């Protein structure tokens, strides 16, 4: 009874804090660029959310007697906790990683918000594990898969950001090209010496400004691309270990390493997509933009694999889904 009450309290605290964080991010996004007070409140809220989720997982573990990996609700809680870990590690190391934190914070907010919302109320109660899940492989397989999903989602979102910035800049350049002398086909820098001093200064200032913007944009995109590559590489390792451990577990439980179950099929598709991403990074003939497109596709594939199959409740991996077996 005590554990159930504590779990209930932690769930409501985390949901309340997440709701406040959503409001803070919406205010920052829609009305103001940056307010120090709101930024500090967001950081403190993330810390509170992290400890609430940690306490929730530990309480559920002690109360149920098994690792909290048995259904969609518990895996979502663990997923949001994994996102929080990626946020907290740089925080405790006193090292700032603005790019990852910008991606991680909304991920924690919406994952935890969905998990603790009324949509999954029926799954909030801890239940006894079904026989197929009563295995020591549960921790190895599920934890590696969730770590892989979380890491790959963070890296994929960085790639999505690269595409958004690239195409946004492309649209702006096309729209404003007529306003710049040096973007006009009839203009050449040799004509500067025939201009008066005012026009000459205007052209040079615009040229300098555009060069600075291009340099800053290039550096920014390179940093996003570098962190995206590192994050996806780590997530690919987690995903590979998770798939292999799952195959070993399947052989023990069902007598076959691979059954082409919907979850297994989409896990293989996810693995293939990110294998292609890593291949494009190693191939110098392929541009970085192409790898970002592949990673962005992978972002959608992960959600189909992780959430879509569970919501449909089909196949051997439908434990704890909306649709009963």
UniProtKB/Swiss-Prot annotation:
KW Thylakoid (keyword) present: yes
Gene label: ccsA
Membrane topology category: Multi-pass membrane protein
Oligomer and partners: May interact with Ccs1.
Record Pfam families: Cytochrom_C_asm (PF01578)
Keywords on record: Chloroplast, Cytochrome c-type biogenesis, Membrane, Plastid, Thylakoid, Transmembrane, Transmembrane helix
Cellular compartments per GO CC: chloroplast thylakoid membrane
Organism: Glycine max
Superkingdom as given in the UniProt entry: Eukaryota
GO biological process: cytochrome complex assembly
Name of this protein: Cytochrome c biogenesis protein CcsA
